Regions:
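PAPS-dependent sulfation machinery
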Residues: 119-167
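Generic internal hydrophobic packing segments that stabilize the cores of diverse globular domains
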Residues: 57, 61, 86-88, 99, ...
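Post-Walker A helix-loop "phosphate-sensing" segment adjacent to the P-loop in P-loop NTPases
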Residues: 108-118
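Phosphate-binding P-loop
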Residues: 79-86
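Long, basic/Gly/Ser/Thr-rich N-terminal segments
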Residues: 1-78
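Glycine-rich phosphate-binding P-loop
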Residues: 90-110
């Protein structure tokens, strides 16, 4: 199977993301070569069944959609790139070592701003949102978490999922 003709082909996923968002500016194209390598590896080495192929394709298309939305946001609000973040605190650690709890503890202090799960999962607000009312990303994130936990209730024991909490 030719990579370009499959759901894991570079042009397939890029075209799908453009069609889904109605956007076409990905910004810097440096992501394309590594993405092509990933897609080729998924086709040639991952031994995916049809569900796995469709799942990986959907995941990559969603990531590309987020890239398009973020670039669109930068294009609409270029002043974002001039914002200065003074004294950032970055939390890095291995899984299951308490990094989420540390993030949430620091986030409870008003001197810090922490990105919430839904903001991390969907970094750019929708292009048509006027910044009044509830952020539309929140309901999508809550539904996604609900779906993950419904599909695998054991996830709740591994990670404290909360769309509105720091993560």
């Amino acid at each position: 199977m030719a990579v370009s003709a499959s759901p894991l082909g570079l042009e397939y996923v890029i075209t799908a993301a453009k069609q889904r968002t109605g956007l076409s500016d990905f910004g810097d194209d440096s992501f394309r070569a590594p993405l092509k390598i990933l897609l080729e590896a998924l086709v040639e080495q991952a031994d995916l069944n049809e569900a796995g192929t469709q799942g990986q394709s959907a995941r990559i298309i969603e990531i590309l959609c987020q890239r398009l939305l973020v670039q669109n946001f930068f294009n609409k609000y270029p002043e974002i790139l001039t914002e200065e973040i003074l004294n950032p605190v970055v939390i890095v650690g291995l899984p299951r070592t308490g990094t989420t709890m540390l993030h949430r503890a620091l986030g409870s202090d008003q001197r810090f701003y922490t990105s919430r799960w839904f903001e991390t999962r969907f970094p750019s607000p929708p292009t048509d949102w006027d910044f009044t009312g509830e952020d539309p990303r929140l309901s999508v994130a809550k539904a996604e978490i609900r779906g993950m936990l419904d599909a695998n209730p054991d996830l709740a024991a591994m990670h404290p999922f909360d769309a509105e909490a720091a993560d």
